[in-house]
Amino acid sequence: MLPDRTGTAARAGVRLAWSEFGSTHGRADQPAIVLLPTWQIVDSRFWKLQIGPLARHFRVITYDGRGSGSSDRPSGPAAYSNAECAADIIAVLDATGTDRAVLVGLSCAVTWSVIAAADHPDRIAAILAISPSCGFPVAQPRDKHAFDGPYAGHQGWATYNKTFWLQKDFRAFQEFFFGEMNSEPHSSRQLEDFLDWSADCDPALLVDATEGRLGLGGAACSDIELRCRQVRCPVTVVHGTDDRVRPLSVGERLAELTGGTMVVVPGGGHALPARQPVLINRLIRDVMHAALPVSAAGAVADRPPAGGRRSSRAGRPPKILFLSSPIGLGHAQRDVAIATALRGRRPDVQIDWLAQHPVSAVLRSHHERIHPASGALLSESRHIETECGEHDLDAFEAIRRMDEILLNNFSIFAELIESEQFDLVIGDEAWEVDHFLHENPDLKRFRFAWLTDFVGWLPMPDASDRERELTADYNAEMLEHRSKFQAVRDRSVFVGNPGDVVPDLFGPGLPSINSWVQENFAFSGYVTGAPVPGITDPASLRACWGCEDGDLLCVVTVGGSGVGGALLRRVLDAVPAMINRVPNLRFLVVTGPRIDPAALPPTHRVSMVGYLPDLHRYLAASDVAIVQGGLTTCMELVAAGKPFVSVPLRRHFEQNIHVRRRLAQYGAAGSLRYEEAAVPDLLAEAVGTALTRPPVYRSVETDGAERAAGLIAELV
C-alpha cells in the first residue's frame, strides 16, 4: 500500500523516514495510530498486514527506526539507547503534526513506548504492547548465553552473541531468530518475509543497537520497572503462550506494573502481527476506539458482540452475501447460474455480491446487486498479472505472495458482516474468507457454504523439493483447520463429480485427496455458465464477425485476467500459417475485460473484441477454439461438443494437473505446450488436426446449477 504522505523527522542529527496512511481520516481531536519500529534487524515493513485495514478508518503513521530502512544509521551503542529510541517517537509526532497518538509496539519497541508515555503523558493516548521484550528481572532460559560474553556455539540462543555475529555466521543467527519469532506451525511465508526484510542488516550496526538497548558499551539504561509505574495512559498487553523470544511472564509483568489489560493468545508466538493479523488488527481498533473522544466513539457503539450467532431475522427476507473468486471469469459465470437457480427455489432471498473486477463486469451484465463495500477491495487480478511471465504463472507462489491483498480483502468482508446481518455467506474459492474464518472462528455469525472445483495445492512434476514441502505444508494446514473447526463450513460443495478429483496425496504422510474430498464434500456436478441449448441462431452470431457461408470460425480466448496477452500474440503470429493450412478459416479473438484489443496488431481475417458477456454462445457457434487452459472455457467447449486446442500456462498447477484430470474424465485429454504453440506451423497443425477429427466427448451434465442451489438452499 502506498502512503498518502512521506517525510523525515530530524532529531540530534539523525533523520527518521516516516510514512502516513489514511490521511483523510480523523479530526484534529482524534489521536493517530503510530506503528512503531522494532529491533533494528528489520525495517517497518513488518507492519504490512496492519496498514491497509487500519488506514481505511484511521490516520496511521509508520517510520523506519534509526539504523534501519530509509532512516539514518548512527554509530555507537549510545545512539541506540532506549531513551534515544523513545525520543524518536516524539520527534515523529512533531514532524507529522500529531498531537496525540496510540502507540503500537512489538517486542523491544514496547520499552520505547513506555518511556515516551511516561515522559509525555499529554501526547500518548494509549499503548498496545505486543510480545513485549522489556528488561524485567524475569527468568528466561536464553539468559544463560551472554550477548557480550565468549562465543559458545552454533546452536540456539548461543548464536545471540556479538562475536558470533561479527566473526562467525550472522545469517545462521537470522535464520534461527526468525524461526523462533515465527514458532507457530505453517509459518513459512512469515519466515521468508522476515529474512527478506533483514537482508541488508549490517551485523556491526545490530551489535551497536543491541548494546544500546541492553545498556552496554557505555549506553545508559534506565529502570524500566520504574518507568512502567509512571505510565498513566491505558495499556493493553498481548502475548502468546508459545513466545520463544520472550516468555509470557514478561507480558504479565508489564500488565501488572502498568495496571494494564492482559490478552493471552493460546499457541501464539512472538511475531503476532504477522501470524495473527486479524486478531491484532481488531485489538488495535478496539484500543483506538477506546481512545477516541466520546462523540467519535459513539459511531461504533452499536457493533455486535465478537462471537456467537445473531438474533433471528424477525420476518425479513433472508440475506445472502455471495463471494466469487476474481481470478478469471469462470467462477462468476457459474455463480450467477447458481444464484439464479437459488432464487428459483427461494424467490424471497436477497443476494448481495462482494466482488471486484472482472467478476463485477459479469455481475453487471446480469443486473446483479454489487455491495458498495466492494469498492474497497484490492485487485487480485492485478497481482496475478504482475506475477506472470510470458505465458508463465507459478500459481501457487502467486497466491502465497498475495497475503497482504487477501488480508485486506478479508478485513473488508469482516467489517461488512459486522455491520450488516447476513444469514448465509457463499464463498466460491474465496480463499481469504475460508482461511481467516478458520483462524478466527469466533467471527462466524452466519451460515457458510464453500464452493470449489479443485482441492489440493500440488507441485508441478518438475518442482523443487522446497515447492513440494510448501504445498504439502499448506495442505496440512487446511486439513488441520477442517479437523479442528468443522463448524466453520456448514456445507462444502465440490463443483464436479468424484471422478474429477485428482488421486494424488495431499503430501507425504497425508491423506489421498480423492478419498478426503469424497468424505468431506457434497458433489454438484459441473456447473455450466448457461445452457448451450439457449443458442438459437449460431449463423447470426458468426455473421456478426464477418463469417460467410463456407467459412470456419476459430474463437481465441484467454479468460478474464490479463495474463493471456503473450498467447494472443503467438496466435496472431500463426494466423498466416493457419490460413495456409485451412484457407476458409476466420478468427474471433476475445481478449477479455483486462486486455485492450487495440494493444494487439490488426491481422487479416481476424476480428477482435474485449469482454463478451455471452462468450459461451460464440464458443458453441465456433468450429474450433484456441484457449488458455482454464476449466470453465474448456468445459463450455466440451459441453458444446467443439474441438479445441488448449495451451495451459506454464507452472500453473491447477491448469496442468487439476483441469487436465477433469478434461480427461470427459474424453478431452491432451493439450499443447506453449513452446509448441509459439511455433506457427505447429499451432497451425494442431488446429488443422482438431478440425479434421470430430471430438467424442462424454456428455456434460446440465443440472449442476440446480444441484448446487439445492445443496445451498438447505442452509437458508
Predicted stretch roles:
Residues V14-R73, A78:
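Conserved HGGG/HGGXW glycine-rich cap/lid loop of the alpha/beta-hydrolase fold
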Residues K48, G52, T62-C108, R282:
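Active-site loop/oxyanion-hole signature of alpha/beta-hydrolase fold enzymes
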Residues A118, A125-F164, S646:
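Flexible "cap/lid" loop of the alpha/beta hydrolase fold
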Residues A139, T163-A220:
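Conserved alpha/beta-hydrolase catalytic His-Asp/Glu region
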Residues Q230-V231, V237-H239:
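Short beta-strand/loop motif that positions the catalytic acidic residue
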Residues P318, R345, V349-R400:
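Conserved nucleotide-sugar phosphate-binding/catalytic loop shared by glycosyltransferases and other
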Residues L458-G562, G592-R594:
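A nucleotide-sugar donor-handling region in carbohydrate enzymes
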Residues G507, G525-V624, E676:
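Donor-nucleotide binding loops and adjacent catalytic segments primarily
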